[in-house]
Amino acid sequence: MDATFWAFIALVIFVAIVVYMKVPGMIGRTLDERADRIKKELEEARTLREEAQQLLAEYHRKRKEAEKEAGDIVASAEREAKALLEEAKRATEEYVARRNKLAEQKIATAETDAINAVRASAVDLAVAAAGSILAEKVDAKADGNLFNDALAQVKSHLN
């Protein structure tokens, strides 16, 4: 019986004690628990990944919706700006047309006033000339009557 034999016997006794103490079962249970824990962690990771993908898809959808809404807002603002520009242009054209019409009316009134003033001056001049010609050719009594008659005729034609 040499040392190898006694080492073998010690090994067999050690293995018997380990089996008697149910160490392989404890190791198996520990490994099974660890495997179950890893499976749960993997399942949680898979669930979290799916949720993250869903959130990412939702954020992409919301971003596209926000971009579309922003585009709609910009298009609406452009339409409103164009409408306001057209309205301002139309209002300006109407204002200019009204001002032109008013200026034309003032010019026409001024022309009429000028023509009336020239006519009045011409009448006054004609009356004065007629008066001086008649004064030279007619005596004083006839002069007064003739002048008054002519003045009455001119006044009746002007009114």
UniProtKB/Swiss-Prot annotation:
GO terms for molecular function: proton-transporting ATP synthase activity, rotational mechanism; proton-transporting ATPase activity, rotational mechanism. It comes from the Bacteria. Keywords: ATP synthesis, Cell inner membrane, Cell membrane, CF(0), Hydrogen ion transport, Ion transport, Membrane, Transmembrane, Transmembrane helix, Transport. It is a single-pass membrane protein. GO terms for cellular component: plasma membrane; proton-transporting ATP synthase complex. It holds the Pfam family ATP-synt_B. It is found in: Cell inner membrane. The chain crosses the membrane at residues 1-21. Belongs to the ATPase B chain family. NCBIfam families: PRK09173.1. F(1)F(0) ATP synthase produces ATP from ADP in the presence of a proton or sodium gradient. F-type ATPases consist of two structural domains, F(1) containing the extramembraneous catalytic core and F(0) containing the membrane proton channel, linked together by a central stalk and a peripheral stalk. During catalysis, ATP synthesis in the catalytic domain of F(1) is coupled via a rotary mechanism of the central stalk subunits to proton translocation. F-type ATPases have 2 components, F(1) - the catalytic core - and F(0) - the membrane proton channel. F(1) has five subunits: alpha(3), beta(3), gamma(1), delta(1), epsilon(1). F(0) has three main subunits: a(1), b(2) and c(10-14). The alpha and beta chains form an alternating ring which encloses part of the gamma chain. F(1) is attached to F(0) by a central stalk formed by the gamma and epsilon chains, while a peripheral stalk is formed by the delta and b chains. This is ATP synthase subunit b 2. It comes from Brucella abortus (strain 2308).
